[in-house]
Amino acid sequence: MWHNSCKCNQKDASPKPTIAKGHHVPGTRYPLEVQPNIPERLARLSELAVDLLYSWNRPIRLLFVRLDPVLWERCGRNPKLMLRRVGQERLDEAAQDPLFLEEYQRALSLHDTYHTVRIPSRLMDLDPKTDLVAYFCAEFGLHESLQIYSGGLGILAGDHCKAASDLSLPFVAVGLLYRQGYFTQTIDAQGNQIVGTAPALLADLPVTPACDDEGRELRVSVTLPGRTVALKIWRVIAGRISLYLLDSDIPENTAADRAITCQLYGGDRETRLRQEIVLGIGGVRALRAAGLQPTVWHINEGHPAFQILERCRELVNQGLDFDTALEIVAAGTVFTTHTPVPAGHDIFDEELFGRYLESYVTDLGIDIAELKTLGSSPISQGGFNMTALALRGSRLHNGVSRIHGEVASRMEAYIWPQIPWAENPVGYVTNGIHVATFLAQEWSSLFDMRFGSEWRNKLTEASYWERIDTISDHSYWSVHQSLKAAMLEAVKKRVIRQYRRNGVGEGLIHRLTRQLEPDAKGPLVIGFARRFATYKRAGLLFEDPIRLARLLNDPERPVLLLFAGKAHPHDHPGQNLIRLIHEFSRRPEFEGKIILIEGYDLSLARRLVTGVDVWLNTPEYPLEASGTSGQKAAINGVVNLSILDGWWGEGYAGDNGWGICPHKGLIDNAQRTREESAELLDILEQQVLPLYFDAAEHGYSRPWIAISKAAMRRAMPVFNAERMVLEYTRDYYRKAARHARLLAQKEAAGGRTLAQWKRAVAAAWPGVRLEHGNDTPESLKVGESLHLTILVHANGLHENDLAVECLFESQDETGEHIVRAQVQLAAGGVDSEGRLVFHLDHKPGTSGFQTLRVRAYPYHALLAHRFEMGCMAWL
């Protein structure tokens, strides 16, 4: 069990003394850390150690590696901790070493240049002097030295921060400081996932207290039932941006409240609710305490959505009514949803939510029923849905791939019940990964040698990356083989430790790891590393174990399968998948051919995505929102073999990997799983293996290298975080900033007007209906005009409150009706019966059989999206 018996509220001090085991070593060992004095010539090492720029600036990071490579690994690649542990003699030696001093000065130059030189603006109407984007997320994965992340959401948030920094975007991030972070994982001899925790000492983390201009540490507070919880604010420097982290583990609080920010995704539903109050409400207050006034607020997944209520409360305190406040707040808010799985959306039961949020009702000037309405949804069953709150409290919403955008539009269609799902306001921005973080050093060095340093400034130019094909196959293959060998060596060290701890004999260890010795003949290495959730179907390969065994045991075409990943401690089916793979790996026919690696983390992930040959992804369609691990693999020339879901639905081009079309139709999940498993094995047997082992006289397969180059060439300029953040800036941030300013100016005149208009429209809309004013002709000649008159029973609304539109549709080859044109009708006054009159005079642009549909919907110039009210009437 993964309990919430958090040890975070102990004093932040050195580890406890340990009792020596065994009669031959008597007494107690008391920890004592003797910290070195950093020589004056290296004084700024301390500054470099607390700027997470080191997480993506390789020369800065390598400076610490070269200081003491062994200690670097022992300290978990944590520069701040390393500087406390490094030997005085080594520091003194480095201070006299001309080569080290040269690298030190280079690192300082890179650091200072990064912070002082601004790149040419591509921010598209965002003014760094007046605009600020505040990005809220429950987790951030910037580097393993700050473990406040669990997986894809956190890594994506970290990459977003890094790209925002690289682009000099006016940007600040807000999260929670988890002392325990996410759980650590070991796998025992029976394949059981063993959950552990590793509380971090604050002194080890790259964080500093956030202070005001006079140097006083910043504190804010939030109200919980019967008490006030104090929060300390920590600041993380990540290049040009700051990340503010809230911490409840301070002496002013009770033990229970100190544990609120202890563990990421730990504890029960009440703990989760407390965390989200701290993140959303406390996060807004933290930014105010820091003197920051964001103009755009980005809610990354539903966890921080309570910030909407806090910002509304601020405006209500300034004299606005709640509806007006909500319009202004929503106008400046962007919401990104990340999961198509219902279980991924936080829902709090009515009693719990009411108990914790009742004090905010009075502050907002509404009753509890109105507040609950903001979080209502079909799946909440009377509870409060944080995704629903985020959707209703924002005006710009998106999924994280084209397919996921469509899925999210369907899932969240209840917000706009009368709007066809394909037209509702949910869009998409496909995720991207931070190239400087995940591109292997060997590839960076090769690009520097072949292309010069300019390639770093060409990350969004597709034509530039055509030059990948100019790299000789021999050079290209040599880099990949070097990365593969390093990956296999790292994996071998990990699994040998794992096996020895589990009591595996040395003879069996040798047999289990014999394929981790690369040679010219192979093996082909297939990697599967991600969260072990059931919808990701880690066991898809094992539907036909006899056929799989035949593939893996061909001596002429050796194959190695590497699996890694964690299952949430409460996800028992996910843990069963881990056991399943472990059991298969110990069968005689799979011995040494399937390896399950424990302790999946960022370091292992970087090794795998740069070193395997094939990246396998087998989600149940359409439940893979994005799948950024495949993007990380592709930019390193690793070939994807994946279900066409998430990003791969856009990334697959036929020449850059393999895609499995989801098997749809009237089949159950079990049948679909069997069919897709068979197709996966077909592709491996008939395409992947023959191509990879087509070595001919070169010692490597030229056709394989062509696919690998295409994978890199196509992924690099499209699926990177720089493109992603620029897209958010163009399509979301600048619109939110402009819209919020428009509604807030002149003492919120626009917000008041829009709120009043929406109330009037909502009251009148049930009585709105359309009827014909003339007969619709059944045929026309090309060049003739179609004349229509539509009469609208407007129920008190005026002609400028409505848009009336005619849709021209025709069928495609599948029989689906496709909208070919949308034409607005012109207002023509009021008839004798008080009906609004609208006219159409339109010449169809194409001949052939078509159908027409006419609809009306509310219109106001201040709407962010024409369908945001969710109202529509059809003829």
Region locations from a protein language model:
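Catalytic cores of carbohydrate-active enzymes across secretory and cytosolic contexts
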Residues: 2-875
